[in-house]
């Protein structure tokens, strides 16, 4: 597939997601990094968003709970280029009923080339990168060219 670039502003749109067994880790991570996160627009799936907001007083745009469609909503925002970074603490040792949604979310994050961290170590590296507060260009699929070729 051909690619193009999209401009990402210095203020990022960051998605915060965590499975039940990982919510406490994400909340603690957010508390530790509140000084970084407060400079960005934050989104989260339902329960996670409310818990983070309560623990940190950060403003969170909460979507539906993951199993109720929040993962799908987040995937749609990624495909619409409305999410720039995703922090997703998931539990590789426990299957969840909405596992296909989780896999779809991870896939769409990879397709649209958004930086995403799936554990504390990678989240720390990502949030502490000098690029997190800078304008950047991301290489993404050129959907218009793809569509034009398919419609010929």
UniProtKB/Swiss-Prot annotation:
EC number: 4.2.3.3
Catalyzed reactions: dihydroxyacetone phosphate = methylglyoxal + phosphate
Disulphide bonds in the chain: none
Domain MGS-like residues, every copy: 6-152
Binding site for substrate: 19, 23, 45-48, 65-66, 98
GO biological process: methylglyoxal biosynthetic process
GO molecular function, one term: methylglyoxal synthase activity
Keyword presence, Lyase: yes
Active site: 71
Key word Chloroplast present: no
Keywords, alphabetical: Lyase
Alphabetized InterPro entries for the sequence: Methylgl_synth, Methylglyoxal_synth_AS, MGS-like_dom, MGS-like_dom_sf
Signal sequence annotation: none
GO CC field: cytosol
Family: Belongs to the methylglyoxal synthase family.
Function: Catalyzes the formation of methylglyoxal from dihydroxyacetone phosphate.
Name of the protein described by the UniProt record: Methylglyoxal synthase
């Amino acid at each position: 597939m051909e690619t193009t670039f999209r401009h990402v502003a210095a203020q990022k749109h960051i998605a915060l997601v965590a499975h039940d067994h990982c919510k406490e880790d994400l909340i603690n991570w957010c508390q530790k990094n509140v000084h970084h996160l407060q400079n960005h627009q934050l989104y989260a799936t339902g329960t996670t968003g409310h818990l983070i907001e309560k623990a940190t007083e950060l403003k969170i745009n909460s979507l539906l709970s993951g199993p109720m469609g929040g993962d799908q909503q987040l995937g749609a925002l990624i495909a619409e280029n409305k999410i720039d970074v995703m922090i997703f603490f998931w539990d590789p040792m426990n299957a969840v009923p909405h596992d296909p949604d989780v896999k779809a979310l991870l896939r769409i994050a990879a397709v649209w080339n958004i930086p995403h961290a799936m554990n504390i170590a990678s989240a720390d590296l990502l949030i502490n990168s000098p690029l997190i507060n800078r304008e950047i260009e991301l290489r993404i699929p050129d959907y218009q060219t793809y569509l034009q070729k398919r419609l010929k």
